[in-house]
Amino acid sequence: MPKRSFHWLLVAGLATGTLWPSNDPFVGKWKLNPSKSKLTDRMKVEVAGPNKYALDVGGGVETIVADGTDQPGLSGTTVSITVGGPDAWKIVRKKDGRTLVTGTWMLSKDGQTLTDAFRANQQDGSTLSLDYVYKRTTPGSGFVATWESTSEQMNSVVEFQIEPYQGDGLTFVTPAAHQTLKLIFDGKDHPNVGPDVPAGSAYSARRLNERTLEITDKIKDKVTNTQQFELSPDLKTLTQTAHPADQGAANILVFERE
């Protein structure tokens, strides 16, 4: 679940010293076009003991007893698994008692398909709604298997705004998440900040050209994600292509200028 949260953890780095003016082409308000976007997700469930499971839903393995109680998870969060039957699980992640995300998992009758109603609570009180369908890619019983997404449906409006910052910098503003990220073009690693940010999280980036940014995310010096943001020649479309380290395929998000 952590990897499917929509974070705009960006900074831009520039080794050449060239400056972009305040009329940077990235500046503007951007809205996700779900019909042109493609999200690919992979998750793994293994048996770790009696009624105990090792989950890897992005970011690392968490071992959880499926008894409905909150148990220690990654990055200071807690995770609970509530079993609603052989074909139904509810997974809830919290931070400091506040629910961050909820995943309602359902198995098909033949056990080959998993649907996940993924809901992420935003800082402004709204809910990000995303429905995934997965196929089983390894043998297993019930939810125990490796699962790879085959389709997704975004049910929420996703918007963010890019503003100038200190001459050649940029500020990314995500209103629903109450996130304001100030980007400095110095080519150095910078710590991520915020209440829900994993410990040891950092990012660095560079401009490949005037229409493309490349950003690398790390946790404790380990690369977790590399992504590019590329503007179309007419500057009306912004395409984010993300390559999570634990995924074989890229996630592609297409935004249109408002």
Model regions: which residues?
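Hydrophobic small-molecule pocket/channel-lining residues, especially in calycin-type beta-barrels
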Residues: 22-258
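Bacterial N-terminal signal peptides
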Residues: 8-18
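Bacterial N-terminal signal peptides that target proteins for export
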Residues: 1-9
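Intrinsically disordered, low-complexity peptide-like regions
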Residues: 5, 21-22
